[in-house]
Amino acid sequence: MAAVRVLVAPRLASALLPLSRYHRAPSQRAALHSSAPRPGARVALVLSGCGVYDGTEIHEASAILVHLSRGGAEVQIFAPDVPQMHVIDHTKGEPSERESRNVLAESARIARGKITSLAQLNAANHDAAIFPGGFGAAKNLSTFAVDGKDCKVNKEVERVLKEFHGAKKPIGLCCIAPVLAAKVIKGVEVTVGHEQEEGGKWPYAGTAEAIKALGAKHCVKGVTEAHVDQKNKVVTTPAFMCETALHHIHDGIGAMVKNVLELTGK
């Protein structure tokens, strides 16, 4: 047996050596991907954690990344380095008592480790910014989930929105995230879908009234559509505000991304 171990050990070590690189910390400033043969639009993707009930809606983030990749964009992912409002046990839909998580650390799961603190995001280095939904947008990027129309927006999120808007660079938001633009950008036009629940198809339809109360204009759109506010260069789509098949949500996000990229002029 000793002889067998002597023979096997070096071979095992050699076999595992190529895998070791996957355990190294990736460069935080590296783009997640760059699929264009020539420089395309540089897009900042802002996450709010990992998981629909207390962070980023993962399917939305993935759909955005797929459509950005297809559009030849270079993507860099950001998230605020702050504690989550709370942690939800996604098997029960209930808060996990005595547990806390960090928004940046959780968002890194979606970014495959390639993530940067939102405090380092400078609009001058990017052509557009996109915010996926998930309750993290209403809990970690703002207090909308608790305070509704009287909500406050995270100071770094507010800064980023104002910087991109001031520079006339496009901003994309989906699902519940349009409330961020409604709060920060005066008179902006956004959509979160329909304004009536319609038998449960639009369970969060009441959000439209809160958006109006914030001084924004709500525009009714279907789940596969995106609304483009040409004046403010803000593009929104309902995504998971609608109870529907995943491919419809994917298509709506595709419409949002397409319009954002077109507005960059790249």
From Swiss-Prot:
Q: Which residues carry this modification: N6-succinyllysine?
A: K201, K221, K231
Q: Where does the transit peptide start and end?
A: 1-39
Q: Which residues carry this modification: N6-acetyllysine?
A: K149, K155, K162, K201, K217, K221, K231
Q: Which UniProt keywords apply?
A: Acetylation, Mitochondrion, Transit peptide
Q: What do the Gene Ontology cellular component annotations say?
A: mitochondrion
Matching CDD domains, A to Z?
Answer: GATase1_ES1 (cd03133)
Q: Where found, per UniProt?
A: Mitochondrion
Q: Which InterPro entries match?
A: Class_I_gatase-like
Q: What family is this?
A: Belongs to the GATD3 family.
Record-linked PANTHER family: ES1 PROTEIN HOMOLOG, MITOCHONDRIAL (PTHR10224), GLUTAMINE AMIDOTRANSFERASE-LIKE CLASS 1 DOMAIN-CONTAINING PROTEIN 3, MITOCHONDRIAL-RELATED (PTHR10224:SF9)
The protein in question is named: Glutamine amidotransferase-like class 1 domain-containing protein 3, mitochondrial
